Amino acid sequence: MEKSGYGRDGIYRSLRPTLVLPKDPNTSLVSFLFRNSSSYPSKLAIADSDTGDSLTFSQLKSAVARLAHGFHRLGIRKNDVVLIFAPNSYQFPLCFLAVTAIGGVFTTANPLYTVNEVSKQIKDSNPKIIISVNQLFDKIKGFDLPVVLLGSKDTVEIPPGSNSKILSFDNVMELSEPVSEYPFVEIKQSDTAALLYSSGTTGTSKGVELTHGNFIAASLMVTMDQDLMGEYHGVFLCFLPMFHVFGLAVITYSQLQRGNALVSMARFELELVLKNIEKFRVTHLWVVPPVFLALSKQSIVKKFDLSSLKYIGSGAAPLGKDLMEECGRNIPNVLLMQGYGMTETCGIVSVEDPRLGKRNSGSAGMLAPGVEAQIVSVETGKSQPPNQQGEIWVRGPNMMKGYLNNPQATKETIDKKSWVHTGDLGYFNEDGNLYVVDRIKELIKYKGFQVAPAELEGLLVSHPDILDAVVIPFPDEEAGEVPIAFVVRSPNSSITEQDIQKFIAKQVAPYKRLRRVSFISLVPKSAAGKILRRELVQQVRSKM
């Protein structure tokens, strides 16, 4: 095997130590989370920055057991689906753990969804109960399903004239006496624990079935570097939505099972994030590119004491080297890292190794322990050696079971040898670092050349007068497609289209040059921070 991890069989293997998974097939993600908690019972587990509530690991374990009995009394049985439609709070992970402790399947929906969008997900996942909040009740009252409203007794208002199927979170807790054990349900690692809907960048949203074993494996992959560095009792701020795999698996579950503390935030607001880092002495911050941009470019960052912060990690979309260096200047003494994962891989494929120190290379790091990969040529279907691009295929114990009710999509994504075809274009360098170039379907085809929008976007946001940017294809009779950009100017900037075109032309081959630049106030993005290029493509084409 080369130092890149590339083998003679065309497979890249992780350069990290071997992943050790629990051997007992009857291990649930909940029993695994609390396996060591008796040695730190009074340590902070969860703090809710919005309400001031907090729980130690001992209190968390008791609350989850009691809530599990409550859901059991409400009739939730093994394989029953429970939908949560709510923003982050300390009660969100309690519900996740309580539902999965009794063999239920936890599915999540974006609080920004319309009635129509929630309706589609309810039709697909068939939940028995909806967990939500007062503010969103109007969107779910028409589904004729029992509802549990999160919040405290004082803040939950049971809407007048509504049916008797509405309970508060406290009501569910009170259905059971304080208990120390969960209702007995036999749970296997291969059982489905969560049904998370993929962002649908390739079309309609699909329900990704993730097992107890997937969560356990992914959590060990995510936290192995902490073991290697001898780091304990970190404090992780979670404003990334817990309805998404990044917030739920990579931050919430992975860190709690490691004995780290979690600080929840209901929504992202830069000043509030900075205040909470200072207040809770946060050590680790996982973000998505729009937040990374804000941390790089906003002067308000300098007004807060961020001395506790050791790491900022970013995922969801590739970040360029220039932007990482800019962020490093704005927040010195913090290690900046990137990772790569997707819902289908329980949030992790690769992550940079903090033991290597500051690099800001623009890479998504080395394969997580236990993960194998291939880079497969889009033209020939053959495995590619280092520094050759192709589609990223991955395999490992963190890969999904499949898509719910969609055998065709499952078959198209997972092949007979268990490789998950990611649809992402990338390559490994000679040191085994993965570089994610872009989504294959989003590449711009210019006279047979391929132009990656993410590469041009990375160059654009490296300019001090540019706050954000998106690049999309524009139909062209001669070339097929040409790259055009939509740019958000920095405050007080008067940068012009010509200035931007010249700035890019100096740095790229002629076929990658921008043919047009338009100015917009906001780049459309998903809750996970991914650019919604399709929306802009559709807008542009509808005006042609």
From Swiss-Prot:
Localization of this protein:
Peroxisome
Catalysed reactions, semicolon-separated: hexadecanoate + ATP + CoA = hexadecanoyl-CoA + AMP + diphosphate; (9Z)-octadecenoate + ATP + CoA = (9Z)-octadecenoyl-CoA + AMP + diphosphate; octadecanoate + ATP + CoA = octadecanoyl-CoA + AMP + diphosphate; tetradecanoate + ATP + CoA = tetradecanoyl-CoA + AMP + diphosphate
Q: Which organism is it from?
A: Arabidopsis thaliana
Its needed co-factors are: Mg(2+)
Top EC class for this record: ligase
Task: Identify the PANTHER family for this entry.
Answer: 4-COUMARATE--COA LIGASE-LIKE 7 (PTHR24096:SF425), LONG-CHAIN-FATTY-ACID--COA LIGASE (PTHR24096)
One GO location term (cellular component): peroxisome
The phenotype of cells or organisms lacking this gene is: No obvious phenotype in growth, root and flower development, fertility, reproduction and morphology.
Keyword Ion transport carried by entry: no
One Gene Ontology MF term? fatty-acyl-CoA synthase activity
- Give the residue interval(s) assigned to the motif Microbody targeting signal: 542-544
Q: Where, if anywhere, are coiled coils annotated?
A: none
What induces or represses this gene? By methyl jasmonate.
- Please name the SUPFAM superfamilies in this protein's record: Acetyl-CoA synthetase-like
> Which Pfam families is this protein grouped with?
AMP-binding, AMP-binding_C
Gene Ontology biological process terms from the UniProt entry = jasmonic acid biosynthetic process; oxylipin biosynthetic process
Kindly indicate whether the keyword tRNA processing belongs to this entry.
no
Superkingdom is Eukaryota
Residues engaged in binding ATP: S198, S199, G200, T201, T202, K206, Q338, G339, T343, D424, R439, K530
What keywords sit in the KW lines? Answer: ATP-binding, Fatty acid biosynthesis, Fatty acid metabolism, Ligase, Lipid biosynthesis, Lipid metabolism, Magnesium, Nucleotide-binding, Oxylipin biosynthesis, Peroxisome
Q: What positions does the entry give for CoA binding?
A: R267, K447, G448
Notes on the domains: Both substrate-binding domains (SBD1 and SBD2) are involved in the substrate recognition, and are sufficient to confer the substrate specificity.
The annotated region (SBD1) lies at 269-338
Q: What is this protein called?
A: 4-coumarate--CoA ligase-like 7
UniProt record similarity statement: Belongs to the ATP-dependent AMP-binding enzyme family.
